A protein has these predicted regions:
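A cross-kingdom marker for long, charged
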Residues: 165-213
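Extended amphipathic alpha-helical interaction segments
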Residues: 94-160
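N-terminal Sec/ER secretory leader and immediately downstream segment
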Residues: 2-100
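Extended intrinsically disordered, low-complexity coil regions enriched in Ser, Thr, Gly, Ala
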Residues: 49-73, 147-173, 179
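Functional cleft and adjacent loop/helix regions within the main domain
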Residues: 37, 92, 106-111, 208-211
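Extended amphipathic alpha-helical regions
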Residues: 87, 92, 108-109, 122-125, ...
């Protein structure tokens, strides 16, 4: 799929910034490019959700694939970028939106979009990306079944925070037993957090199969 592009050209010293705060890629040289990207994506998703919760709900209601990717791309408003340009895979944007949605639910936000749940038994899709998606949902379903409180704490933790490190250590023992060998997926923090957030937000009930893993 084509990368989502958000771009904005502004003077750094501009006195007026729209609310919520637009995203900016941190310039801290001690952070890896991946970590800088995670922080910027978090801020971007947070801004987009506040500006267009209805649009986020509509995009996430689309079936996964090119249609949903186009809907996500339309949400990539320049108003949520302080300056410069961001290019990212729509799947990363999707995951960040679910993380922010679940964080806001935990904070008591009552104006969030409703995203329909689904059954893992009805997982469909032939493309590699969709197969990986369902593998991740099955994986996250298993993790939530084994330790839901730890999964919730990990999702709600701020990116690169000490809490994220601690909660990842807490949840690590249940990750291995939930991994199946049928799909090769890189399980980094962002991927794990996004999958857990989707399972938790959409209200998927942990399956008996997951509980038995």
């Amino acid at each position: 799929s084509e990368p989502v592009v958000a771009q904005r050209y502004e003077a750094l010293g501009q006195s007026y910034l729209p609310s919520p705060r637009p995203a900016r890629v941190p310039q801290n040289a001690r952070l890896s490019p991946a970590d800088r990207g995670r922080i910027a994506m978090d801020e971007f998703a947070r801004c987009v959700l506040v500006r267009s919760a209805t649009g986020v709900g509509r995009a996430l209601a689309e079936p996964m694939g090119e249609g949903q990717n186009r809907a996500l791309a339309r949400l990539a408003t320049a108003d949520c970028l302080l300056f410069g340009e961001m290019r990212f895979n729509p799947i990363l944007f999707r995951r960040a939106l679910f993380v922010e949605l679940y964080r806001r639910r935990l904070e008591g936000d009552t104006h969030l979009p409703v995203v329909a749940g689904y059954s893992l038994a009805q997982a469909t899709g032939d493309s590699p990306a969709i197969k990986v998606h369902w593998w991740l949902i099955d994986f996250a379903d298993c993790v939530v079944a084994k330790d839901r409180p730890a999964a919730e704490q990990f999702v709600s933790s701020e990116t690169l925070s000490n809490e994220e490190n601690v909660t990842l250590q807490r949840i690590t023992p249940v990750l291995g037993p939930c991994v199946t060998a049928d799909v090769q997926v890189k399980l980094d923090r962002s991927t794990i957090k996004g999958a857990l957030a989707e399972v938790l937000y959409r209200g998927v009930q942990p399956t008996a199969v997951a509980q038995g893993k």
